[in-house]
């Protein structure tokens, strides 16, 4: 096995967020990752204007760090933006924000994550209504992405955080209905532990449409500080030829830097066996 390993990072984040590295100076974060043997970073931004795309790309290249993806969920948490909102104005703002993120992703040649920005199925609305808005929104975004070098990954998220798109097969159904190769699946072991029945089957089902992975233990601490046996999952990734990053998205326990260093050590040992 030979996988790249990265970390979810943010310039700012609410207390309790599973972002182990939070620093308003993104260049210091890149330095830490490079100095400690990481391969990549996932950068969470409220707005893409918070960073200078060409400058951060050049700095990361100089340090040997890949930017794997841009996290977008802060726009949902702080501003309530989702592409399935009952309010047309909110949907339009969400789509525009994601297009702006895709502009940055095109500069960085990476993906954007649609996690919480997909929204939920609210009381009084049907799954079909929400599916329609999700598919129409993703069609527009996929067409926009096709003009640049960025792409979109949709994350399967557990039932305690959303009631919509919780398993790999549900995300794949949306992708199939959109019909664009600019859309792919994003799996997270923390969410999979609650929603999937097997570690291998969802990965094999996704195949080459799996383009992003988060790793955390069942308690959302770093891998190795919980109950998950990661070996079958990693074997399945190897079987499908997964060539993207394993990104640590875990709580900063006992602190951010310690958590990711321990997670890195655990994964490197596991991959080597």
Predicted regions and their residues:
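Active-site acidic/histidine proton-transfer and metal-coordination neighborhood
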Residues: 25, 81-184
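Active-site beta-loop-alpha junctions enriched in small/polar residues
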Residues: 10-14, 44-46, 72-75, 117-119, ...
């Amino acid at each position: 096995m030979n996988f790249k390993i990265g970390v979810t990072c943010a310039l700012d984040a609410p207390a309790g967020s599973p972002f182990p590295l939070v620093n308003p100076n993104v260049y210091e974060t890149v330095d830490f990752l490079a100095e400690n043997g990481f391969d990549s970073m996932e950068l969470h931004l409220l707005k893409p204007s918070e960073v200078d795309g060409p400058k951060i790309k050049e700095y990361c290249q100089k340090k040997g760090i890949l930017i794997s993806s841009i996290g977008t969920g802060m726009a949902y948490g702080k501003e309530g933006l989702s592409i399935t909102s009952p309010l047309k104005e909110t949907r339009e703002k969400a789509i525009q924000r994601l297009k702006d993120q895709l502009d940055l992703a095109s500069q960085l040649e990476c993906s954007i994550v649609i996690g919480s920005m997909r929204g939920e199925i609210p009381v009084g609305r049907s799954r079909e209504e929400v599916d329609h808005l999700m598919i129409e929104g993703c069609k527009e975004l996929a067409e926009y992405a096709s003009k640049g070098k960025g792409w979109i990954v949709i994350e399967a998220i557990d039932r305690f955080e959303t009631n919509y798109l919780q398993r790999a097969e549900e995300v794949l159904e949306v992708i199939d209905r959109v019909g664009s190769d600019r859309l792919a699946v994003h799996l997270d072991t923390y969410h999979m532990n609650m929603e999937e029945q097997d570690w291998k089957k969802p990965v094999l089902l996704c195949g080459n449409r799996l383009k992003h992975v988060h790793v955390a233990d069942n308690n959302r601490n770093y891998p190795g500080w919980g109950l998950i046996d990661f070996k079958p999952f990693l074997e399945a990734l190897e079987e499908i030829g997964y060539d993207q990053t394993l990104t640590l998205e875990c709580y900063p326990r006992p602190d951010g830097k310690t958590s990711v260093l321990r997670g890195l050590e655990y994964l490197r040992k596991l991959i080597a066996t």
